[in-house]
Amino acid sequence: VLGVAALGLCAEDAPRPWPSEWRSGAGWRSATLEPPNRSGATIGFTQLEGTSTGITFTNAISGELSLRHSILNNGSGVAAGDVDGDGWCDLYFCGIGGRNALFRNQGGWRFQDITAQARVECAGQASTGALLADVDGDRDLDLLVTSVGGGARLFLNDGKGRFSEMLDSGLLRKLGAMSMAMADIDGDGDLDLYVANYRTTTIQDEPGTRLVLSNEGGRPVVKTVNGVAVKGSEYEGRFDVGASGEILENGEPDALYRNEGNGRFALLEWTNGLFRDENGRPLDRPPLDWGLSVAFRDLNGDGVPDLYVCNDSDSPDRVWLSDGAGHYQAPDPMAFRCQSLSSMGVDFADLNRDGFDDLIVLDMLARDHRHRNTQLAWTKAPIGSFGTHAARLQLPRNTVFMSRGDGTYAEAAYLTGLPASDWSWTPIFMDVDLDGREDLVISNGFHRDVRDQDRLAEMRKESATQRFAPNQELARRARFPEWMGGMAAFRQGAELRFEDVSMGWGFGTPRIYQGLAAADLDNDGDLDLIANSFGNAPSLFRNNAVIGRLLVRLVGLAPNTEGIGARIGVESEGGRQVQEMMKGGRYLSCDQATRLFGGVGESATVTVKWRTGRRTVVRGVLINRVYEIREAEAQ
């Protein structure tokens, strides 16, 4: 007890080992969960820092580098999963300006840095995203890491938390790779990989760049960059010229890989009929978007993983509906009538319990009056498309899409109270108060508020009378203030209305949080949060819930050993809830593969529809228990 108290934790936070006594049934086993006895505990979270947890990692870059390489300001993520099979969820943090770090969960909210012996430091690269998944189907968690300029890397686990890099994995070791998601796109049983790519560099970081235009075929094109001909150079395909003459810098093509087994992937082509537009025509070139996030999700209820890709800047979001055999087509233009302008992250939940998944996409609209009125915001519509049914506005705010059940969505951000959450990155729908309705938690903040209209006005005024050398131009960017957004929380109440409860739920620390993941770090059956901070050490947020909960984990057939893509339905007197087991899909981050249900009655029925088409039904399910459901006995 003395040891626990010395850490600033309570006795009820002492290590709680994974259950050793299980009840078994046909295709399942279950064990009792022991919610902590926290007298006087309030709903929400308790923030824990490295002084008590042992997580001393810091994700930071120098001020000069943040000015010269603005893409690095997009931060880094975190991946959660049990890498050594001891029953405790471990954590892997990416560092944008230094080493990455793997921390072994010792229980009792204490973590040990095992990066060196695990051999996953990834020194010398600007690491962005991470994902822990069973890539090779041997029932341990392997590691995927992305970086700016370094693409994606794969490290295979030996089952004991020691990793070896797969140097011939087939993954591209270039491009500005960001977030990742995995799913079985072709029904062959293993997990395929999508990597959202941004850029490695941008001309925004190169003041004084000289672009020369010419007219080719009746349209303006960029002919040279700093005297270098675009055609045949690294600049080919990098720029477009808009209808009003503005020069647009393109992002990089994303990468979709087919899992070939044994830790090897094959890069799939965009232009061989794999991807088709709304009219079913094969794409003639890959989209050159500024990719930030990507998630697989069965959007239309046909049992196969569709895709939602969040793109920054002028790039539109991409929605791709799967045929189950690895081919994708854009939905009808009437499906989504608008989009967020600078989309950061996406998450899904059946908010109104009608059996169809709804979704939120995050942008950068401020919650408070002062910030909102200093932001430079605009609504973007494709020039020349006014009056056409295909025109889609790009809105500078969050968008919430409620499924109508027919493949189309109604935008409902203002109806739900969720149009603004600050400079937001990762949304996670989760039932924090365990009342049976998904609440929403969001990571926020940015190193430089480059949309601050007051600073922009000052700089424009100076530029009218002065000339600045490139180094001086970069230095002027230091005037943009930090946006210490911290964490945000919205509680879902009646009639789809969400209330901002950030302060009441323990999210009062001003900080820049970007990558965010959910996991059960103390084995009490609720979901805690892990936030990777920019310029600071990460924060852990212990969930303070004490009421009834139901935790579901899946044991799938190899090679999809975690049952990724399965739909889990829980039906009781509290109603019906449905969730999907996902892998990756967070901004630069990856949750532990587990699903939490609150508001469940004393007895429930759990139905699992596996990606293979099999089905498992477990009746008489009790609350305050964890259920492990096996696909091997499924029908």
PLM features: residue spans?
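N-terminal pre-domain segments of enzymes
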Residues: 11-60
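Gly/Ser/Thr/Pro-enriched helix-cap/hinge segments flanking short amphipathic alpha-helices
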Residues: 11-12, 44, 52, 62-65, ...
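Beta-propeller blade repeat segments, especially FG-GAP/WD-type strand-to-loop junctions
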Residues: 34-35, 45-46, 99-114, 151-166, ...
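Hydrophobic beta-strand segments that make up the repeating blades of beta-propeller
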Residues: 45, 88-95, 140-147, 191-197, ...
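Repeat-based blade/solenoid architectures
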Residues: 55-77, 96, 119-131, 169-181, ...
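Beta-propeller blade termini
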Residues: 75-85, 104, 127-137, 156, ...
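Asp-box/WD-like beta-propeller blade repeats and closely related beta-sheet repeat scaffolds
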Residues: 117-131, 146-185, 195-236, 241-243, ...
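Short, conserved, GDST-rich strand-edge loop motifs in beta-rich repeat architectures
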Residues: 198-249, 366-392, 446-482
